[in-house]
A protein has these predicted regions:
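A short, glycine/small-residue-rich beta-strand->loop->alpha-helix junction that serves as a flexible
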Residues: 106-119, 300-302
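C-terminal alpha-helical cap of glycosyltransferases
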Residues: 418-424, 432-447
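Boundary detector for helix-to-coil junctions that initiate low-complexity/charged tails
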Residues: 1-86
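Conserved nucleotide-sugar phosphate-binding/catalytic loop shared by glycosyltransferases and other
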Residues: 96-106, 124, 128-177
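A donor-sugar binding/catalytic signature common to diverse glycosyltransferases
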Residues: 346-392
């Protein structure tokens, strides 16, 4: 018994020693990365420049010129217009033993665009490769959504949720958390969906040379855009989801592989509720005329807002119809009392589409393609002030295809005219869905 106990103690001590050694190595690596981040900071490098001048007094004569110039170069790095020096980047963490695992990183935007595309990709991967583990890492607060589908999810709060944290510190948090995820799960692929790649994320994926790195991004990389100039080269493939409009603009030239994939839609027709079930859940009569309104901005209680003008115009047109207003999970709850109005705060709202007769939508990518796929006669309100997203051109395509009408100037009179006109529209039957050989092909090619 005594020898057995001593053997167990020895074995336990060896395990403790191994665990302690592993922890010490990881702490040393973290300290090394923190030192690199500090040495790469603006304050450190400006101080280094001053110190170098002090060590060689003749350089002090030129300091009034070199210091502003050096500050200017560091400023360009800070806003992404100049790549940081290679010495500021940390060495590779090669690991060829990859697991059947994919990490998806949807950033947080104004709405659900980035998240919805990654959520759709996650579900598509599961359909085509059920054994592949899909893991989310995101600053989006809606963590319950992937949990419902049993997708493990890591969360980091957005920078502006913290009271006192610098961009360097926040990027350090991203880098450390991603490296922990990569070490734990050993993913074979990483996919980012966002307009701006964070430096902490770039530093982390750079340390995983055997991991495939994808960037899903709508539109071209425009010359003069604010993305870090060296960021594209951190990825193996750029994925451009399809759109109703094509751009003729030439973007930034780069050598990274580009793939064009079908429009990314989350909900398939067979996943939608029937008309009867949708209306039952929404609490509207089966025989009623039902309009779905989702504009994404404006206060419903402001009588001059577009959404209030729209509600008033609809009820003036037909006081017996019902209106379902799509409310974002990211915003404050809407408070509006009208027996003909229902507030829908759910995700994804597309499961209710069979319960709607007509729709009034903003001209964003997701809204447009959802209406295009479901073929609900729609009045589009394009945002005319989005520099990177030509919503007007997209909505005009829908008008030309017979899907609906575009209202450029939203007055009550114009809205009323559009309401009357859209009721005579019967969208042509066409397949804009994602359940196609094209989807199977591009998802399979990634895996």
């Amino acid at each position: 018994m005594e020898s057995e106990d001593s053997g167990m103690e020895t074995s336990f001590s060896e395990q403790e020693y191994t665990a302690s050694l592993h922890l010490a190595m990881k702490q040393a690596e973290r300290h090394e990365r923190e030192i690199h981040r500090l040495k790469n900071s603006v304050t450190y490098r400006l101080g280094e420049h001053l110190t170098a001048s002090a060590r060689r007094p003749w350089k002090l004569l030129f300091l009034p010129l070199t210091f502003p110039y050096h500050s200017f170069l560091l400023g360009l790095e800070k806003i992404g217009m100049k790549a940081p020096p290679n010495s500021a980047l940390i060495g590779d963490n090669s690991n060829s033993n990859r697991e059947d695992c994919v990490v998806l990183f949807p950033t947080n935007g104004v709405g659900f665009g980035h998240f919805t595309r990654m959520y759709s990709v996650a579900k598509a991967i599961r359909r085509h490769s059920p054994s592949t583990e899909v893991i989310f890492f995101t600053p989006m607060p809606t963590l319950h959504i992937p949990y419902i589908e049993d997708f493990p999810t890591y969360h980091i709060a957005g920078k502006y949720k913290f009271q006192n944290i610098s961009s360097t510190q926040w990027n350090g948090l991203i880098e450390e958390q991603l490296l922990m995820i990569f070490e734990t799960h050993k993913p074979k692929m990483f996919m980012f969906d966002g307009a701006y790649p964070y430096r902490g994320m770039l530093n982390a994926i750079r340390r995983e040379p055997s991991m495939k790195k994808m960037w899903m991004r709508r539109g071209m990389f425009k010359k003069g855009s604010k993305i870090p100039v060296d960021s594209i080269q951190f990825f193996d493939t750029i994925l451009h989801p399809g759109d109703a409009i094509t751009t003729q603009e030439r973007g930034v030239e780069h050598s990274v592989e580009v793939k064009h994939v079908p429009p990314i839609l989350l909900v398939k027709e067979e996943e939608m509720l029937s008309k009867e079930e949708a209306r039952s859940r929404l609490g509207v009569p089966q025989s009623a005329e039902v309009w779905y309104v989702q504009l994404g901005a404006g206060q419903i209680n402001d009588i001059e807002s577009e959404i209030r003008l729209t509600i008033d115009a609809l009820l003036e047109h037909n006081s017996e119809l019902f209106i379902v207003i799509g409310e974002s999970l990211l915003g404050k709850r809407v408070s509006f009392s009208n027996e003909r109005v229902r507030i829908l705060r759910d995700y994804p709202n597309a499961i209710y589409f069979k319960g709607f007769d007509y729709s009034i939508q903003a001209g964003g990518y997701n809204s447009f393609h959802e209406m295009r796929s479901s073929q609900i006669p729609t009045i589009f309100y394009p945002n005319m002030n989005t520099g990177m997203d030509n919503q007007f051109a997209r909505c005009k395509v829908g008008e030309q295809e017979g899907l609906g009408l575009v209202v450029e100037h939203r007055t009550k009179e114009n809205i009323l005219c559009a309401i009357k006109a859209v009721k005579s529209i019967r969208p042509p039957k066409a397949d804009y869905g994602t359940d196609s050989p094209d989807e199977i092909e591009w998802i399979s090619s990634l895996l």
